[in-house]
């Protein structure tokens, strides 16, 4: 099958959730299909990206999105009904280039990741199209609007509510232009504002079972280590990091204890959290090493949508997890025996202290969670489901 894939970013390196999801989907689709990958980018692809992706696809095309034209479009974005992020990623010259490629390649099906790329292909009717919503972006934006504070808080809340409303209308409208639709979790599907949302197929993320399996020689920790990972420029992760350090850590009775915030592109707000008890790593070449030296994984996420790769990775690495309902619910498994789910700072602190004092409970919970992840969250099984959806659309 000839598949043309449209991505709003080059899916490497894997420091963002959309990149990680698409990279592993390509990795498992590649052996059996002819894939043309088209990526939007505002700078040339580098050697590492080319090396990582060229072995996965038959052809790799980078569609330049001009910086000056992008900012010119944004000046008029307030007058457009399109979501701001759709305007940001939609470039006229890139669209012409993509349509030329579509006519040259003649794919059996087009796979578009995220609604921000939908304008490029929604009116191209010569080929079946599949849209990966990935997350319910409109719901995520509305949640973030409630957490905007400070001097610019009112302006930020208004802008986020506006974007959330535009995204909701767009998620509903663009539904009609695609033959099939997929999304990351049942929770997110419930938030898609369309009468036929139940027809959206669930394609969860997976986890690399070998890369994140438990190690036979875990790093020796000089003190209990609480780990939180993720792209530290992404607002839901920034908020969770601040919540962990400012609201939860002071209530933890166990001392000494260390918090590690591991992830790329830390904002200044995250860097400012560093202290004698808090380590901010920045980019980590192999994030699995951070799981292997952690005692507990703590994810007090309050914002965002979708299934969290970080939770899958922690559980697969046999790290006991203390999670917010927001982080745990998309897994679709019972919390009993798999994680401790907490809704407020004191319950987080109490759970952390209890687990740190009970290695037997840590081990039992880690084993139970790992078994569930190995059973239900392999990339192979989930990409097989996506492959069948693409085949059905192409017929």
Predicted regions and their residues:
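Acidic donor-binding loop of glycosyltransferase active sites
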Residues: 179, 292-306, 317-320
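Acceptor-binding helix/loop patch of EC 2.4 sugar-transfer enzymes
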Residues: 67, 71-84, 130-169
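A short, active-site helix/loop in glycosyltransferases that binds the activated sugar's phosphate group
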Residues: 47-49, 119-121, 165-199, 268, ...
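A short, well-ordered alpha-helix in the C-terminal region of glycosyltransferases
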Residues: 361-376, 382-385
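N-terminal subdomain of nucleotide-sugar transferases
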Residues: 1-62
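Conserved catalytic-core segment of nucleotide-activated headgroup transferases in glycan assembly
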Residues: 167, 172, 194, 198-293
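Conserved acidic donor-binding segment of nucleotide-sugar-dependent glycosyltransferases
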Residues: 339-346, 354-359
């Amino acid at each position: 099958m000839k598949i043309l894939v449209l991505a709003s970013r080059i899916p490497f390196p894997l420091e963002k959730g959309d990149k990680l999801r698409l990279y592993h989907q390509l990795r498992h689709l590649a052996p059996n299909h002819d894939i043309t990958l088209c990526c939007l980018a505002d700078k040339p692809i580098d050697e590492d990206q080319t090396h990582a992706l060229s072995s996965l696809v038959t052809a790799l095309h980078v569609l330049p999105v001009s910086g000056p034209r992008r900012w010119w479009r944004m000046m008029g974005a307030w007058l457009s009904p399109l979501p701001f992020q759709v305007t940001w990623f939609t470039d006229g010259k890139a669209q012409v280039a993509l349509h030329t490629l579509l006519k040259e390649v003649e794919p059996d099906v087009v796979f578009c990741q995220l609604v921000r790329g939908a304008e490029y292909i929604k009116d191209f009717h010569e080929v079946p199209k599949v849209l990966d919503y990935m997350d319910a972006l409109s719901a995520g934006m509305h949640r973030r609007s409630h957490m905007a504070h400070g001097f610019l808080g009112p302006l930020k809340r208004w802008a986020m509510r506006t974007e959330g409303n535009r995204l909701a209308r767009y998620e509903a409208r663009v539904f009609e232009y695609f033959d099939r639709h997929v999304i990351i979790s049942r929770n997110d599907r419930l938030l898609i504002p369309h009468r036929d949302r139940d027809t959206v197929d669930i394609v969860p993320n997976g986890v690399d079972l070998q890369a994140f399996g438990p190690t036979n020689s875990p790093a020796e920790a000089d003190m209990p280590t609480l780990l939180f990972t993720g792209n530290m420029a992404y607002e839901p992760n920034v908020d969770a990091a601040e919540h962990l350090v400012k609201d939860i850590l002071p209530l933890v009775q166990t001392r000494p204890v260390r918090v590690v915030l591991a992830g790329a592109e830390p904002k200044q707000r995250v860097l400012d959290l560093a202290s004698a008890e808090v380590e901010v790593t920045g980019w980590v070449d192999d994030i699995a090493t951070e799981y292997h030296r952690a005692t507990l994984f703590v994810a007090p996420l309050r914002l965002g949508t979708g299934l969290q790769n970080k939770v899958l990775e922690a559980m697969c690495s046999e790290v006991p997890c203390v999670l917010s309902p927001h982080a745990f619910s998309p897994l679709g498994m019972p919390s009993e025996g798999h994680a401790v789910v907490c809704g407020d700072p004191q319950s987080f602190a109490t759970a952390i202290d209890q687990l740190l004092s009970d290695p037997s409970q840590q081990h039992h919970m880690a084993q139970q969670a790992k078994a569930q992840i190995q059973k239900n969250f392999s990339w192979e099984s989930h990409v097989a489901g996506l492959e069948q959806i693409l085949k059905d659309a192409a017929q």
